[in-house]
Structure formats: C-alpha cells, structure tokens
C-alpha cells in the first residue's frame, strides 16, 4: 500500500486557524456504514446519537508549553520542541539548529537557564535542563504552546485554554487530542443526563504526530513512539459496557491507538508503556464500536487509521462531502462520528 493512496486535495481556506467561540458548536458529520447517507450536524447533537449505557472514552493527557528558544555558545539560534519529560529535569526533544549540537554542549535559553545536550535518542536529543524549579513547573511560564505547523500564526493566550481539553489532567503531551477539544461542560452534562458513561485513558501525544510519512511504501514506515496508560478501571468499564449491550466510542485516534495497543489476543488488558502501533487498512480495530475524530492531513497515519476502521473508500467519500460542504479541517476544525464498515 502506497502513501499516495491517502492523498487528497484540500483548499487552504478550509484549514481552521482558530477555534470557534463555543467548543460544541463545531460541525459533526455523521458517517454511518455504507450505503446509508451522511448527515450534517453539530457536536452538541451527540446526545441524540448515543444511547444510555454507551461509553465515551477520552484521552486525559494535558499539553505542556513545550517549545523553547535559545542559542549555542557560538551564537547560533536554536529551537527546542520537547517530545517527552523524562524526570530528573531531563527531556527528550527535537533540536533545530544550523548545525547539530554535540554531546556536552550547552544551550542558553531565552527564558533563562540552560539545556545541556547529553546525547542522542534516535532522531531526538536527551537534554538536561538547569532551571530554578521543576522542569514541568518552569515550562508553564517559560515555554510556548506548540501549535501545529499548519496553523499560520503565533499562539495567543486563548490557545492556552482552547488547545487543551476540559478534562486534561495528566501532563505530558506536546499536541492536543483534538477530538476531545469539542467537548464542553454543557455537552458533558447533557451526555451524562442521557445515561452515557465516561472513561479515560492517557496517551501523551508526541512531536512525531506532526512528522510526515516519508516512505512511499507503508511497510517501510517507522512509526513514532508514544507513552500510554490504559488503567484497570477503564478495562472494567469497557467490559461492563459490552456485557450490558452498550457501545464503546473512542474520542479521537489517540484513544483508539491506546486501546489497540492494550489489546492481547482480542481482549483489552491494563497496559502502561510505549507503543509504536501503526494501523493501516487490513488491520481490524476491535476496541471501539465508533469514533469521534477530526479531519486529518493528507497522507497522515491518522487518516490511514480511520481508513482501517471505516474503509478507505467510505472515508474518502466523507472527506469529499466535508470539503463540498465547507467543513473546517485539522486541529481546530470540525469532527465526524464514524462507524465501522459493515462486515
């Protein structure tokens, strides 16, 4: 299977550059199995589409202000994007500079303090930070929010709230689980009143989520690593839901990635650790019965994943419908409620 099989043409003006005033006012494209028709709705219509006893699974990761700037001893400018906090004031990061920094070199940070290069970890660097408080706390005021590269503006104060889900609590992501951005307190209350249950996993979305697939043949693609935690409580919630005839709905590709990484011989089990799972058509997703997901970039691994779930032809039909109806795409864009292909 080729990367180019997942390309499509998107007018640039459909790439959302800012969130709507209300989270749940985003549009929602209902995509049932073929041949049923698509339906244009809003995210706040979700309670009418779900049933009592259904389980919505959210990703509770919290985005850190992970972008930093500084300079090397030579005076060369450096941009740092933290990929993961490692503990002990260390982090794994992408480092952008005119020349690759060497182990032992130090970067003077614009926000104060220094980052010492300890060595390489694949395409990343391991950095030791010398800052006056815990790295996590220091980043809250010293770091910049790492908005995706297709958002063509500098992050503002509103982004600190809006590029974060209302249920974010586990610090560690460098990108938001964007399907969750549509859920506000009124919508969550309406879903609860409907009898819909909520569960959470944690998957810390890494900088690799923005990296393009470079291999033409998908079997040659090396998937990026991300850390996740699927807890015992969530596993029990899923089992109870299924036993009672309810549906499990994953809110976002990160939730599905976490759940599928925790599947063992067709059974969901507690799991904490790294995953490199790469889901493409031909893979059968068993952990969820439906997905809420945003519209994804051409040739992206996320587009490949939802094509595995709902069928590539069906997904591309939905995307063409969304383009024709002027839906908003990508992180701050609209969403779809996606059901699996029949059979």
UniProtKB/Swiss-Prot annotation:
It is found in: Cytoplasm. Its main location: cytoplasm. Keywords: Cytoplasm, Queuosine biosynthesis, S-adenosyl-L-methionine, Transferase. Pathway: tRNA modification; tRNA-queuosine biosynthesis. It holds the Pfam family Queuosine_synth. The keyword Transferase applies. It catalyses: 7-aminomethyl-7-carbaguanosine(34) in tRNA + S-adenosyl-L-methionine = epoxyqueuosine(34) in tRNA + adenine + L-methionine + 2 H(+). Its EC number is 2.4.99.17. InterPro entries: QueA (IPR003699), QueA_dom1 (IPR042118), QueA_dom2 (IPR042119), QueA_sf (IPR036100). One of its GO terms (molecular function) is S-adenosylmethionine:tRNA ribosyltransferase-isomerase activity. One of its GO terms (biological process) is tRNA wobble guanine modification. GO terms for cellular component: cytoplasm. Monomer. NCBIfam families: PRK00147.1, queA. HAMAP family: QueA. Belongs to the QueA family. Transfers and isomerizes the ribose moiety from AdoMet to the 7-aminomethyl group of 7-deazaguanine (preQ1-tRNA) to give epoxyqueuosine (oQ-tRNA). This is S-adenosylmethionine:tRNA ribosyltransferase-isomerase. It comes from Stenotrophomonas maltophilia (strain R551-3).
């Amino acid at each position: 299977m080729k990367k180019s099989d997942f390309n499509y043409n998107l007018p640039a003006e459909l790439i959302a550059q800012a969130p709507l005033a209300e989270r749940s006012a985003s549009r929602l494209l209902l995509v049932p199995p073929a041949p049923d028709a698509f339906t244009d709705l809003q995210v706040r219509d979700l309670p009418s589409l779900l049933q009592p006893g259904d389980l919505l699974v959210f990703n509770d990761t919290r985005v850190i202000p992970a972008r930093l700037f500084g300079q090397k001893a030579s005076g060369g400018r450096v941009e740092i994007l933290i990929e993961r906090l490692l503990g002990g004031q260390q982090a794994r990061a992408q480092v952008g500079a005119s020349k690759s920094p060497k182990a032992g070199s130090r970067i003077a940070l614009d926000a104060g303090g220094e980052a010492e290069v300890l060595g390489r970890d694949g395409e990343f660097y391991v950095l030791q930070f010398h800052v006056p408080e815990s790295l996590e706390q220091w980043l809250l005021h010293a770091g910049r929010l790492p908005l995706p590269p297709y958002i063509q503006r500098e992050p503002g104060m509103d982004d600190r709230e809006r590029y974060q889900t209302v249920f974010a609590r586990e610090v560690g992501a460098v990108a938001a689980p964007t399907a969750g951005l549509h859920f506000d307190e009124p919508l969550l209350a309406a879903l609860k009143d409907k009898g819909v249950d909520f569960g959470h996993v944690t998957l810390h979305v890494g900088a690799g989520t923005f990296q393009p697939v470079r291999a033409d043949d998908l079997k040659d693609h090396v998937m990026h690593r991300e850390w996740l935690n699927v807890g015992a409580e969530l596993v029990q919630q899923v089992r109870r839901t299924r036993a009672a005839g309810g549906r499990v709905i994953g809110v976002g590709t990160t939730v599905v990635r976490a759940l599928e990484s925790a599947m063992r011989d067709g059974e969901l089990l507690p799991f904490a650790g790294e995953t490199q799972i790469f889901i493409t058509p031909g893979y059968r997703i068993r952990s969820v019965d439906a997905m809420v997901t945003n519209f994804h970039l051409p040739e992206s691994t996320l587009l490949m994943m939802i094509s595995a779930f709902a069928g590539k032809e069906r997904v591309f039909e939905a995307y063409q419908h969304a383009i024709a109806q002027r839906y908003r795409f990508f992180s701050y864009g609209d969403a779809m409620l996606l059901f699996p292909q029949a059979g």
